[in-house]
């Protein structure tokens, strides 16, 4: 579960390396975000020459969480880190590559471009 002030690794080549969650989108007073949810975040670390700079406020979708997610068949999926992909308003990624595996739950949220760019979908 991701909440306000949570730091996440960025799993794309948009130029950001680490982001800090400002707000969880999707309902008033929503506290936690899980895999496939959209957040508003601030860039805390960035690579030089990237499209995204330190201090930029961006939207991102969560692709991996340590707490994991429960699937309809009763199984759980967990990852070793919390990670997100920076997106545009039309749910397409800002970067051109995705690093590491992503969860199958992104397909249900309409993030097909992220699923197709990912090297592995679990």
From Swiss-Prot:
Subunit structure: Part of the 50S ribosomal subunit. Forms a cluster with proteins L3 and L19. In the 70S ribosome, L14 and L19 interact and together make contacts with the 16S rRNA in bridges B5 and B8.
HAMAP family: Ribosomal_uL14
Name used for this protein in its record: Large ribosomal subunit protein uL14
Family according to the record: Belongs to the universal ribosomal protein uL14 family.
Keywords: Ribonucleoprotein, Ribosomal protein, RNA-binding, rRNA-binding
Xref: PANTHER family: 50S/60S RIBOSOMAL PROTEIN L14/L23, LARGE RIBOSOMAL SUBUNIT PROTEIN UL14M
Gene Ontology biological process terms, A to Z: translation
Species this protein is from: Streptococcus sanguinis (strain SK36)
CDD domains with a match to the protein in the record: Ribosomal_uL14 (cd00337)
Ribosomal protein as UniProt keyword: yes
Taxonomic placement: Bacteria, Bacillati, Bacillota, Bacilli, Lactobacillales
Its job: Binds to 23S rRNA. Forms part of two intersubunit bridges in the 70S ribosome.
Keyword flag Ribonucleoprotein: yes
One cellular component term from this protein's GO annotations in UniProt: cytosolic large ribosomal subunit
């Amino acid at each position: 579960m991701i909440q306000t002030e949570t730091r996440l690794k960025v799993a794309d080549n948009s130029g950001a390396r680490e982001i800090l969650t400002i707000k969880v989108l999707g309902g008033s007073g929503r506290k936690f975000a899980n895999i496939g949810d959209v957040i508003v975040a601030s860039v805390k670390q960035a690579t030089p020459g990237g499209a995204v700079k330190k201090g930029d406020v961006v939207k991102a979708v969560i692709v991996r969480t340590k707490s994991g997610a429960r699937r309809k068949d009763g199984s759980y999926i967990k990852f070793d880190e919390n990670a997100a992909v920076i997106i545009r308003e039309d749910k397409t990624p800002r970067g051109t590559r995705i690093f590491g595996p992503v969860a199958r739950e992104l397909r249900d949220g309409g993030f097909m471009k992220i699923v197709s760019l990912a090297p592995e979908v679990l």
